[in-house]
């Protein structure tokens, strides 16, 4: 059975600029927007016991079980874990740059620049079990199911959320957000009829990289069968409160004096 999962990448952009005051003050603005839709998981559940999941995009869980889990969570906790296959996610991005140049006079020129970027990447649930070992959490076991006339037999240790034995709901995915903002300025001045030159620069940047997820906050839950994860739902284990922020401020002053050649 084939599935059609949508992928879409459109980029829109515009630039404009010109003089605010003739020969004195100028501006320039550039902007881009990316309308991105990223395909979700291509893995699908089985429709019946006995169906093979040894290859391709078929995983062990039954479609009826995944539907029952979702129905139970909606009814019992009013929590929608999302879809388990056949979905896409929106991952928009944008970039903005603005610049102003001021020719104060023939010896002084000033410029300011502003930059802002935003990206958002979709990721499947982490397979990490840190600080515990996956073999301790998922001990493996023996399956009595028969496929193509042969018993499945032993399931190895450590078969977690991303193995062929499991499926995760879409709200267990997480987004890595990257926001970057910078402001910079420059003052270039000449003195003594050009014999002296001074360049003063400053820059401030702020990088914010939080994680986010769809749906409300809900505990991470792994349902095991035969010692291996069968279904996973709830917020990604390492996403809530996970962020990285960096602020940098720099200022430099360069002075040059041309004393001539003796």
Feature annotation, model-predicted:
Residues 3-5:
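Short, small-residue-biased leader/transition segments that mark boundaries at the very start
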Residues 8-123, 175-204:
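Transmembrane beta-barrel wall of Gram-negative outer-membrane proteins
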């Amino acid at each position: 059975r084939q599935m059609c999962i949508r992928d879409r990448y459109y980029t829109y952009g515009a630039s404009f600029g010109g003089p605010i005051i003739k020969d004195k003050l100028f501006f320039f603005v550039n902007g881009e927007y990316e309308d991105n839709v990223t395909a979700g998981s291509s893995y699908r559940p089985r429709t019946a016991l006995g169906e093979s999941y040894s290859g391709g995009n078929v995983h062990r869980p039954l479609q009826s079980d995944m539907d029952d889990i979702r129905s139970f969570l909606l009814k019992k906790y009013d929590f929608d874990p999302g879809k388990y296959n056949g979905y896409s996610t929106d991952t928009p991005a944008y970039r903005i740059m603005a610049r102003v140049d001021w020719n104060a006079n023939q010896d002084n020129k000033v410029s300011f620049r502003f930059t802002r970027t935003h990206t958002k990447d979709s990721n499947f649930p982490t397979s990490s079990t840190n600080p515990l070992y996956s073999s301790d959490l998922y001990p493996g076991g023996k399956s009595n199911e028969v496929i193509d006339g042969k018993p499945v037999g032993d399931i190895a240790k450590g078969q977690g959320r991303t193995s062929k034995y499991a499926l995760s709901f879409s709200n267990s995915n997480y987004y890595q957000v990257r926001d970057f903002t910078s402001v910079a300025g420059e003052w270039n001045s000449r003195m003594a009829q050009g014999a002296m030159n001074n360049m003063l620069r400053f820059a401030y940047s702020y990088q914010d990289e939080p994680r986010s997820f769809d749906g409300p906050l809900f505990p991470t839950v792994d349902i095991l069968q035969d010692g291996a994860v069968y279904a996973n739902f709830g917020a990604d284990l390492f996403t809530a409160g996970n962020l990285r922020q960096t602020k940098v401020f720099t200022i430099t002053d360069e002075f040059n004096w041309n004393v001539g050649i003796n």
